[in-house]
Amino acid sequence: MTSALHESSIKSLPLLGRGKVRDMYAVGDDKLLIVASDRISAFDVILDDPIPGKGQVLTELTDFWLRKLAHILPNHSTGIQPEDVVAPDEVDQVRGRAVVVKRLKPILVEAVARGYLIGSGWKDYQASGSVCGIALPAGLQQASQLPEPIFTPAAKAEFGMHDENVDFAHVVKEVGQEMAERIRDVTLRLYGEAARFAATKGIIIADTKFEFGLDDNGTLHLMDEVLTPDSSRFWPADGYRVGISPPSFDKQFVRDWLETQPWDKTPPAPRLPRDVLEKTAAKYREALDRLLA
């Protein structure tokens, strides 16, 4: 397998923080260097074993979608090459896995679009017949396609905690009526266009999560990762069946293996065997290869 990057170490720039996957550095006062590591998390625990090549896949896919969807909404891209903002001996850490982006004020709402009933949406529907306050028809099954895509926001949780599904009124309270409607409408438009494109490649985008931010003029921008296996459920269309949870192009191998282990889902997690690492890396790569083919 190719070598993997668990954690970047860019000494030439101030480190602002590390998320589950990304490390963030300041580039002056108005830009950020974001490095996508090969870290992987499961059950909100960061694992010790990285997935080789994962960070490059996430970066390449996000770049692809940002260019493809740029006519809908401005995004955080600057066009500056990450190799140009780090020291020469740090270039290998950023090549193919980092971006230099505008420093935006993040909107603290997860903008989720769902076209299919799965995951927390399926659990909510089973309990109440609705998702995020949106009533759905009776009789839907797990993985059913919805009559039309829906906007199902979530409140950002503290690190290590699960995001909480909320209704549209919560978003209005956070950002105001006009901005809430703008976020909802653009989320559904981005999802719709991406889902139609992915369908031509034999991939169903069941749901996805977008992140938005504002520039100094208050203009809404698309930011962070976009339509990757980490932020979306990608299903192979030929494996889709209503009533079951379809296979997906993501870390399912990792989750499934961990479920077989005597582990209480608190750190530290068990070490992953080589075959699980290799299969997971291949799934991420397959999603990229299919979409960009």
Swiss-Prot record:
GO terms for cellular component: cytoplasm. It catalyses: 5-amino-1-(5-phospho-D-ribosyl)imidazole-4-carboxylate + L-aspartate + ATP = (2S)-2-[5-amino-1-(5-phospho-beta-D-ribosyl)imidazole-4-carboxamido]succinate + ADP + phosphate + 2 H(+). Pathway: Purine metabolism; IMP biosynthesis via de novo pathway; 5-amino-1-(5-phospho-D-ribosyl)imidazole-4-carboxamide from 5-amino-1-(5-phospho-D-ribosyl)imidazole-4-carboxylate: step 1/2. It comes from the Bacteria. Keywords: ATP-binding, Ligase, Nucleotide-binding, Purine biosynthesis. It holds the Pfam family SAICAR_synt. GO terms for biological process: 'de novo' IMP biosynthetic process. InterPro entries: SAICAR_synt/ADE2_N, SAICAR_synth, SAICAR_synthetase_CS. Its EC number is 6.3.2.6. GO terms for molecular function: ATP binding; phosphoribosylaminoimidazolesuccinocarboxamide synthase activity. It is an enzyme of class 6 (ligase). Belongs to the SAICAR synthetase family. This is Phosphoribosylaminoimidazole-succinocarboxamide synthase. It comes from Bordetella pertussis (strain Tohama I / ATCC BAA-589 / NCTC 13251). The gene is purC.
